[in-house]
Amino acid sequence: MVISVSLGAQSYPILLEPGALTRAGEHLSLDRRVLVVTDSGVPQEYAQAIASRCRQSRICTLPAGEGSKSMDSYHLLLREMLRLHMDRGDCVAAVGGGMVGDLAGFAAATYMRGVDFYNIPTTLLAQVDSSVGGKTAIDLDGVKNAVGAFHQPRAVLIDTDVLRTLSPRQTAEGLAESVKMAMTCDASLLSLIETASDLTAALPEIIARSLRIKAQVVEQDPTEQGLRRVLNFGHTLGHAIESCAGGELLHGECVALGMVPMCAPPLRPRLTAILQRCGLPTECGCTAGQLLPYLLHDKKAASGSVTAVLVDEPGTFRMETMTPEEILRRWEERNA
């Protein structure tokens, strides 16, 4: 299956099929120097499958975890690109989850003012969301995605076979992003996630439908000037929770926690039940006082306020300018 992201000169395909990694040479332009970036939590054969099809390559394996999305790791990748004598005709390939894609994409965006970038996501979260859209970033001083750029990939290669290696927790994390898109854009997708007798068997359809939503939103708003902010549903509180939790919670788990307060009170029990069905947390110990400093540093904030995404009915959304204090009031009242 091919899903196109139509952005004029920056258009690219999302190639979605079982066994796609074994056919990477057919789909990606790899007859050049390629820095293949992965992490220690990804089976090494995935990166090798890409590297073996390159004219010249170097695999850079980072420690797994958000801690690698740092300035130090960014500098490491740039140095590896220099050692490989890469020029503007060469490329970077990210093989891994969201951390790898964000970091490798940012290195590609800034090395020699930009080189080609291929995203080969190996987690469900990255497959349904972060691999598409060109957002790249690193964290700085505990602030998530504080430094970044928009840099669209040349292609996204999704091999659904790799999902077999994920833990139940990693699968649940990815489902959080699909729930986010369903809540804001597709009520029937929400019903599928809510009622499917076998969520694992339904994953290919969930991935494809999530990607179509993401592609349509990115096409209309590639640099997040308006509509694309809908994809931040759950993320304003979610990023604050992620920073507050200090690595104990995964990104998708924090998004799940951040969605419930931002939907209408009558909808919260249904959303909570869906998240629990997916294996996601719906409670954590972060207090409003602990979350406030991180909300104040939210990159989406302007003049002391944030444009928050709210959901009153599944498949719909509205945006409202809110202060951090107003958002935290929703956090405190989420179970009311």
Describe every region a protein language model picked out.
Residues 1-91:
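ATP/NTP phosphate-donor binding region
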Residues 15, 29, 106-196:
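A glycine/threonine-rich phosphate-anchoring loop and its flanking beta-alpha core
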Residues 17, 36, 70, 121, ...:
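Residue-level signal for inorganic ion chemistry
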Residues 83, 152-155, 161-168, 176-188, ...:
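Generic secondary-structure signature for well-ordered alpha-helical cores
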Residues 99-106, 127-128, 239-240:
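Short glycine/serine/threonine-rich phosphate/pyrophosphate-binding segments
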Residues 103-114, 244-248, 264-265:
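Alpha-helix C-terminal capping segments
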Residues 176-178, 267-336:
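C-terminal charged capping/lid subdomain of soluble metabolic enzymes
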Residues 192-290:
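Active-site segments that bind and position negatively charged phosphate/pyrophosphate groups
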